[in-house]
Amino acid sequence: MDSKESLTPGREENPSSVLAQERGDVMDFYKTLRGGATVKVSASSPSLAVASQSDSKQRRLLVDFPKGSVSNAQQPDLSKAVSLSMGLYMGETETKVMGNDLGFPQQGQISLSSGETDLKLLEESIANLNRSTSVPENPKSSASTAVSAAPTEKEFPKTHSDVSSEQQHLKGQTGTNGGNVKLYTTDQSTFDILQDLEFSSGSPGKETNESPWRSDLLIDENCLLSPLAGEDDSFLLEGNSNEDCKPLILPDTKPKIKDNGDLVLSSPSNVTLPQVKTEKEDFIELCTPGVIKQEKLGTVYCQASFPGANIIGNKMSAISVHGVSTSGGQMYHYDMNTASLSQQQDQKPIFNVIPPIPVGSENWNRCQGSGDDNLTSLGTLNFPGRTVFSNGYSSPSMRPDVSSPPSSSSTATTGPPPKLCLVCSDEASGCHYGVLTCGSCKVFFKRAVEGQHNYLCAGRNDCIIDKIRRKNCPACRYRKCLQAGMNLEARKTKKKIKGIQQATTGVSQETSENPGNKTIVPATLPQLTPTLVSLLEVIEPEVLYAGYDSSVPDSTWRIMTTLNMLGGRQVIAAVKWAKAIPGFRNLHLDDQMTLLQYSWMFLMAFALGWRSYRQSSANLLCFAPDLIINEQRMTLPCMYDQCKHMLYVSSELHRLQVSYEEYLCMKTLLLLSSVPKDGLKSQELFDEIRMTYIKELGKAIVKREGNSSQNWQRFYQLTKLLDSMHEVVENLLNYCFQTFLDKTMSIEFPEMLAEIITNQIPKYSNGNIKKLLFHQK
């Protein structure tokens, strides 16, 4: 028996037997074929040929395959059968095949689906292959058909190593005698693997003028590749039976078997070719054509320490001259002397970590500001005329990589933090109308005041006003302008103050000459902070249109229905207005609803009286710009009595010549004029808010009358008007409840108004309402 075992299939029906040494181990190639279940193959199994040879450094699985006889008939690739017989089929879909970069012949490959093939079918297909293969006595016979462009035997000794894993024999019987199969086509009988290796001019082959494998560079025992001098050497499979080998995954094609057991082969042109996948990693440079599991080591450079290593082209090849690399990091070497490598799984070369380039490290250290001298405290920036403060942004002087100017000019390069607009938080352009704002808010406020726009928020009067959303809600923006203290009078006041300061400067100069004089200062300065009255001006609802068609003859039913529909929309506007009143939303939610249910008629009647007073001098009732009740319409049935009560309000406003500020304060007090007998849930807060607006009414009176002795008298008259509103509203509500309950009148009510009336009727009938009066009757 030779030192290696040979697999010699016969031409009989039964496959050839497998010979093994006594010390030979049976390797488990089907470790992961069935989800981890181990399938041991004995020496008598006809499906595998396994031989073991004891060696001090490695164990080799030696399998002899014929070099192949030349035949004119082109034969497909046999990698399927050999891969299966060697245990390389495991069903992984992530396997990477790399070989075309090194000049391997592109052969078609046939694979079996692991989900559709069982072990019996596998053994039967291998047995068919074994019957059709034969081992020629002279392995050199295949060299007779080499093409003229191939290297000579002297330069490249014929070996059977490089492509043994991808080129195997399939059954090629023709007739009864059968026929020989060839490994390659006519143009692929021999191939030059050195053409794609791109060796430099000083390659071993050119220096020795003989076979490149006989160089001392490759004979060194520390190298990965050993000289392939043995012409009769079978290709070797280096591996450990305990390794978790991930084999080559072939294209998923199910073999077709004839009735007589022959295997039907597909055309090589239709088979998917193996593709090369090169993975690149940052700052990793491989100096050996070995298989390396690459890992990032940070921003450092790695240099391999293999002697005699060459870069194959400019690519980081993950495959050697002989072998297949898988995604798991393992590689199967053929005809390779790996005695210098440790028999460990996922073997990696030892890298020498080279420090980073000094320039990069210096820049990094500078950017990081290492060193106490390069650090600048964020809270120790001093500016002329300012106290020490802490800022949260990085100025140029804080950056160590920027050369700091002399201390005398350092304050010129580092300015204070940018000033922000108090309205939208954009970068402020200056002090406009008494407030530090941007140019956009300045123009907006001027147009809003001069245009007398009555903005109404579509939300809850708490919209976010910033640089991006400042144009979404003009009502909230205008309110925020007033809250910030913007005032058109501030511009005039600023000019006055400037003139006074100039006069003061002139007087101070005279005072310096004559110490007996005293400096003249203004007695009072106008208040620039917003007041509650200014906020009430902002939130005042706009005038609504009734949509009444005056071309159609008037009728009581049509006018009353139109007024109810208009009243429903006015109630909705009143709810939004009440929620925008400062302090009202701080009340309990139930208290807010109760106050609105008790005061909705107060608000509508008082607003109607104000419009009638301002537009018609209390002679007409101006419900809306398109619905004005004149004397002719007042004569309609059931109209005069109600119009008489409403005309009383407008006539009192006209008699007292109520100002707009007084009207706004009185209207707010009417919202707070009726409460339940049991009180509110937040009664103390309610009393505080009500007293606040009573004081605002007094301020409005003082603003109108000045420091006059008539202020208290006017306050008495205005509060008397507020008390009289209870009687007016009571009469209006009685008529409203009557028309609501009397279905024969067929007067329509909007849904929200009908809900309020339904909830309010039992409270009025039970007397569960407490009137808050200023004067005793």
Curated annotation (Swiss-Prot):
Outcome of mutating I193D: Reduces transactivation by the ADA complex
Taxonomy, superkingdom: Eukaryota
Phosphothreonine modification, residue list: T8
Phenotype for S404D: Does not affect translocation to the nucleus following ligand stimulation
GO terms for cellular component: centrosome; chromatin; cytoplasm; cytosol; membrane; mitochondrial matrix; nuclear speck; nucleoplasm
Outcome of swapping L225F: Strongly reduces transactivation by the ADA complex
Cross-link (Glycyl lysine isopeptide (Lys-Gly) (interchain with G-Cter in SUMO)): K277, K293, K703
Region described as Disordered: spans on this chain: 1-23, 130-183, 394-415
Annotated consequence of substituting W213A: Strongly reduces transactivation by the ADA complex
Result, substituting P625A: Decreases transactivation by dexamethasone by 95%
Cross-link (Glycyl lysine isopeptide (Lys-Gly) (interchain with G-Cter in SUMO2)): K258, K277, K293
Keyword list, A-Z: Acetylation, Apoptosis, Cell cycle, Cell division, Chromatin regulator, Chromosome, Chromosome partition, Cytoplasm, Cytoskeleton, Disease variant, DNA-binding, Isopeptide bond, Lipid-binding, Metal-binding, Methylation, Mitochondrion, Mitosis, Nucleus, Phosphoprotein, Pseudohermaphroditism, Receptor, RNA-binding, Steroid-binding, Transcription, Transcription regulation, Ubl conjugation, Zinc, Zinc-finger
Zn-finger segments (NR C4-type): 421-441, 457-476
Record's protein name: Glucocorticoid receptor
Protein species of origin: Homo sapiens (Human)
